[in-house]
């Protein structure tokens, strides 16, 4: 199973000048993974739904929120390989394998469109184990309702990165991600949506360190597996703070936030025309 796989271009198209991955981050390829049976998509933003990756997985089964299927059909994924879900829709895929799309506090949009497709989170129940995948979401009491319906969870995979007070309703702070895991009654929380793309002004390791510390404070177990590391459902998971042994890489604009405060409006005005043009061209390409 894959959740929101993005193995395509280095930049989040159609923003051809960024955001991009951290310099040393791209060290793996889709071809290095085993055969993928199922792909779960949470919403259609470019950093969660990548056209080239989807087309490379054209023999997999896709589970998507309402409206996201239209993108996949345009990209030549057969309709019989796509299942669409509304919030709290459930499906039994095979004996002992049940899934459900659950709400998230976010939005959708691709190209020049906005909110033309649904967004959500996923619950996966495999025999006696339950996994929650948040996708993108701000913090809300919906986590309590999800636990009431499907909990407790062995693992809650929750976004904890790319946060900022300007968009705190659609992305969680690390401390909120821990609270979400507590609300979900999760044995272990795995933080995601961090250390990949530069989408906010916090430091590279800030999400992981804050989640780790908040987990210790609240007695919520946190595991931060490295890429390629494996674990077995139902068995103890390590909480190794590996990022402390990695040299920090903070782009210059994360170190000069005062300058950024002056430059951002100018960059916005200079780039808005380019963004609109590139989004239009990208949408034409996808269509």
Functional labels for PLM-detected ranges:
Residues 57-61, 130-131:
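Short active-site oxyanion
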Residues 32, 65-129, 210-230, 234-237:
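Metallo-beta-lactamase
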Residues 4, 43, 50, 62, ...:
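Divalent metal-coordination and catalytic microenvironments
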Residues 38, 61-63, 67-73, 140-226:
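Cap/insert and terminal regions of metallo-dependent hydrolase folds
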